[in-house]
């Protein structure tokens, strides 16, 4: 295949002329991906990920019938694009994956035992990578090759990332070889990043951040030019999907939270402009941010993982002063709006590595208000964020525990029920005992559903159970949960073991009823 010729757009983005000598076709990189290689990709929540090389490798496997014969250990800061990692999973190209993923095929591979998946707190993953934890059992202690999407290569050879940072600095730090995809379909993000690396103990330093807009790093990622084995032009934008619109349930949850914030301000526990907000992904998170737009709060700040379209509305309303994250995951129309109004948003946003955006040290110092959606919450305020029925992996822990363990306000918001195959309210999200625990009773302050808000700060386990059942459970499940709790309380207090009453032989009867009868509501204690 003939060597590619640099386009005018690529020449404008690559400011170090010697780098253009490494311009190549994706197919030229095939030699760097032997079976069993440990590889890394840039990207976080489906933006800023490499596209050309992963697609080339998938095409190669599909064309030559090599499914299951070219398999890799894949490390990405969080999830990459569905058309890359999800396709790899469908072609049986992933042997091992960490620390977070999104996609039906990759989840299927994990739950069928074909992919060894290890989820980890997102603040810890890049650090553990640099510690050598993920390469400790192989002769080569580094990653074999890392593919990175950039929007510019500067004169010194450092790279300007795109819509996410994630674990890219640490992946490059641990790479033997680096392939850079320069995306000319989107603007250069020069100046929008604050790049830091993870040092090893005993030489680690504190993150000297006291406000959301503080900078402690550089605007680009240093790369050893000797590591770079290929430069490829990419003309494909991130393939994101429209955001989920808020429904009545999400809007009701948002209303309860706004009322709670107003209550905390009135009692002097929050300033009038609140404290930095962290919000997860999904329609409830969107509804909360939308609720803030129509509230009386102003001069807000955001310290979070991912910024979505609703934050643009909050900026445009004049109520959001500054937002920092490790990723901006807009919908296609959101990105169009962002690029069109670049000058309005440019100095109000900052993207950091996930080891900083999710750093417990900073979250605790800033007093962040952390909000996330779980799979289920139990009556004592333990939460399950990952494993349905205790066994089926969804996406991974992500950064939920980074924030919920360390925020000033640790909030779990969830619908009170979800539908099963046969019952619109067949799954209660409030259960007697979580089938898997990611956040403990010691971490959470507030549980909120569309029915109400349970403030469990300072409450004993039995007090928590009563308020969670009363405020949060769906009407269908309130009598069921009360019956379980009252029976457990009676039996355990009678035996002198009633601090946190449980009947272990009944704790999962609701889950059993779901499996056997199609609805938790059909439980019989």
UniProtKB/Swiss-Prot annotation:
GO biological process: acetate metabolic process
Sample GO molecular function, one term: acetate CoA-transferase activity
EC number annotated for this UniProt entry: 3.1.2.1
Task of the protein: Required for utilization of acetate.
Record gene name: acu-8
Protein name: Acetyl-CoA hydrolase
Enzyme class (EC, first level): hydrolase
Subcellular location: Cytoplasm
Binding-site residues, CoA: 280-284, 395, 399
Keywords: Cytoplasm, Hydrolase
Active site, renumbered: 305 (5-glutamyl coenzyme a thioester intermediate)
Catalytically driven reaction(s): acetyl-CoA + H2O = acetate + CoA + H(+)
Recorded family membership: Belongs to the acetyl-CoA hydrolase/transferase family.
GO cellular component: mitochondrion
């Amino acid at each position: 295949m003939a060597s590619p010729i640099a386009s005018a757009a690529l020449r404008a983005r690559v400011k170090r002329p010697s780098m253009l000598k490494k311009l190549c076709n994706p197919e030229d990189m095939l030699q760097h991906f032997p079976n069993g290689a440990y590889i890394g990709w840039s990207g976080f929540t489906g933006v800023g990920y490499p596209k050309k090389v992963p697609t080339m490798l998938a095409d190669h496997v599909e064309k030559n019938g090599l499914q299951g014969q070219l398999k890799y250990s894949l490390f990405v800061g969080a999830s990459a694009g569905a058309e890359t990692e999800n396709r790899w999973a469908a072609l049986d190209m992933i042997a091992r994956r960490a620390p977070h993923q999104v996609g039906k095929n990759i989840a299927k591979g994990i739950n069928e035992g074909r992919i060894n998946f290890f989820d980890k707190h997102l603040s810890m993953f890049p650090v553990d990578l640099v510690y050598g934890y993920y390469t400790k059992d192989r002769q080569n202690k580094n990653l074999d090759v890392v593919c990175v999407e950039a929007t510019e290569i500067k004169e010194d050879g450092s790279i300007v990332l795109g819509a996410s940072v994630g674990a890219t600095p640490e992946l490059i730090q641990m790479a033997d070889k680096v392939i850079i995809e320069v995306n000319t379909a989107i603007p250069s993000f020069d100046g929008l990043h604050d790049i830091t690396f993870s040092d090893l103990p005993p030489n680690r330093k504190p993150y000297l951040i006291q406000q959301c807009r503080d900078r402690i790093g550089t605007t680009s990622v240093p790369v050893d030019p000797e590591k770079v084995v290929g430069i490829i032009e990419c003309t494909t934008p991130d393939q994101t999907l429209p955001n989920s619109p808020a429904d009545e349930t999400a809007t009701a949850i948002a209303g309860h939270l706004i009322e709670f914030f107003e209550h905390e301000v009135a009692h002097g526990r929050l300033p009038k402009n609140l404290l930095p907000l962290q919000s997860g992904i999904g329609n409830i998170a969107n509804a909360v941010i939308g609720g803030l737009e129509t509230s009386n709060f102003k001069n807000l700040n955001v310290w979070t993982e991912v910024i979505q379209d609703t934050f643009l509305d909050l900026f445009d309303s004049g109520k959001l002063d500054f937002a920092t994250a490790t990723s901006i995951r807009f919908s296609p129309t959101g990105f169009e709006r962002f690029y069109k109004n670049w000058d309005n948003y440019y100095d109000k946003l900052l993207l950091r590595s996930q080891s900083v955006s999710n750093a417990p040290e900073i979250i605790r110092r800033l007093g962040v208000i952390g909000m996330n959606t779980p799979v289920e919450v139990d009556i004592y305020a333990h939460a399950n964020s990952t494993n349905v029925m205790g066994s089926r992996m969804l996406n991974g822990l992500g950064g939920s525990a980074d924030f919920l363990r360390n925020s000033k306000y640790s909030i779990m918001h969830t619908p009170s029920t979800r539908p099963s195959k046969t019952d619109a309210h067949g799954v209660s999200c409030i259960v007697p005992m979580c089938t898997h625990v990611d956040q403990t009773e010691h971490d959470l302050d507030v549980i909120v559903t569309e029915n109400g808000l349970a403030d469990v700060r300072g409450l004993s386990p039995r007090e928590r159970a009563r308020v969670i059942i009363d405020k949060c459970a769906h009407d269908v499940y309130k009598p069921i949960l009360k019956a379980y709790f009252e029976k457990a309380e009676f039996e355990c207090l009678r035996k002198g073991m009633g601090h946190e009453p449980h009947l272990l032989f009944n704790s999962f009867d609701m889950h059993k009823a779901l499996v056997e009868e199609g609805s938790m509501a059909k439980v019989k204690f």
